[in-house]
């Protein structure tokens, strides 16, 4: 299928872009010590530019020391300019065009992102300081031009400083920048646009990121007001608008990095409502992962260009594969947000990652070819085993995958049974097809034993046998009636009824609760010794409250079940007086979702040790954990063979 609209050229002021695909600015955490660019950030952008992207927008840069968060690079001195030149040079060498997102975080200062989690109340800006900030935006624009960027983007969304001025509930000023009128609320942003424009060549385009809809705040900027502002901004020198959604002060955060809970294109109706009323190119943002949808939106006139963000994290060749009719070969984003968001807010993570692309942010290392092709036995055809085989084959090795069951897929097939998670099943089935396309044999219905390892005599073994559900050791559980395992519920082998209690508030427990609600079970309670939603990731946990508000799914945190009787549990918790108390609760059905344990692997590793065969145990076979850990370990194991 051809995508003529998506891959047609477009001109922004004096800049001609080869197609309508934009890599939006996304936090990668690849900045070194707040001030330096290493090998990784240029290579990351070069991979997407070489992959066919029309415009790469480099993640946001801070305009001044006061707003310089440790996650981001600054752009307020010549050293920053010279460091960013490494990125623009890499993008240009790969055949792309480069823009940069220029930013002031406003109420989100350094302390918000400090690893100590220390927060301080920000000061009210004086008018003099506002004028200084406007000038600092202009100076950053000047430095960006000198760094070789082809376009600039002014970040005005997501409750950062420009949005704070625009929003009537966040703007509490009473002066000429205050919320007494739309003109006042827009004054700062228009001054910034004019100042940036003064420091840019006449033929260089200036973009601005805005929210297509302002929401979940005490008061909001209306669509009419946004449209009026865009007209004023265009007169001030703006050339295109990049319409996003979400803010950092409410549950609307979920729209900034949309997980699988949101349908692809979820923001497009909001964007289209603005586009039909403005006379300026519009970039659409909203979980676009399919080239057919992107092309359709442009053909229908809802957008002029499309931001393809997480989809290009998952596959940097997204554009080339789409243009060349190889859509089936695209490694698709599944919307888990485990690597692209949870790693951003994890102070231990050095950069973002991706469940579908464990080589993300490691592009600078390349894919080293094997000096000697080795025969590798991969045990387990789940997400980790299949991905290990793919990387091994790509490096020139000869992997063979062995799977004990009759079909590949592992727990990702089961994960896809939960509401809105079909992409997980699709992903692991894609990996199985990719293995076949690459000529990798998958032997199903074969249980690998020490004897088989001795018979095959591989050069290397990777054990990816995964984990299995285990019932907890609770008195009375084994003899109680109407007790189910979450795995059987999601697989459709069992259906609880009536008042249902789910033991375990991790991802499996919460998704089982969602599954039951979708299948007509109306009284569902999730209980956990910690918090409900642990290990689900921040955004997906937030969606529990959005999609299942109030008591739709009841939640009991800090509750430890100590006994199971006849349709009754006994549980202990700490009350407000800090005393441990016990209570009982009736159930009609009890579902066990307390987690998984790694399958035994010692017989396999011992056999390898005796035979002198190098062996790696990866993913849940090593430690029952998330899919993102399995694919990261698969990549690492494949790279060392």
Describe these PLM feature segments:
Residues 193, 363-371, 381, 387, ...:
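Flanking helices and flexible, charged tails adjoining ferredoxin-like Fe-S electron-transfer domains
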Residues 249, 312-315, 407-409, 491, ...:
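Short gly/pro/ser/thr-enriched loop/turn and capping motifs at secondary-structure boundaries
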Residues 254-260, 304-305, 413-420, 618-623:
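Short beta-alpha connecting loops at secondary-structure transitions
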Residues 401-437, 513-561:
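Rossmann-like dinucleotide-binding cores of NAD(P)H-dependent redox enzymes
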Residues 44, 192, 270, 293, ...:
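Hydrophobic alpha-helical segments typical of transmembrane helices
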Residues 1-379, 383, 391-394, 399, ...:
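Flavin-dependent oxidoreductase catalytic cores
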Residues 373-402, 443-457, 464-538, 574-589, ...:
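Rossmann-like dinucleotide/flavin-binding elements
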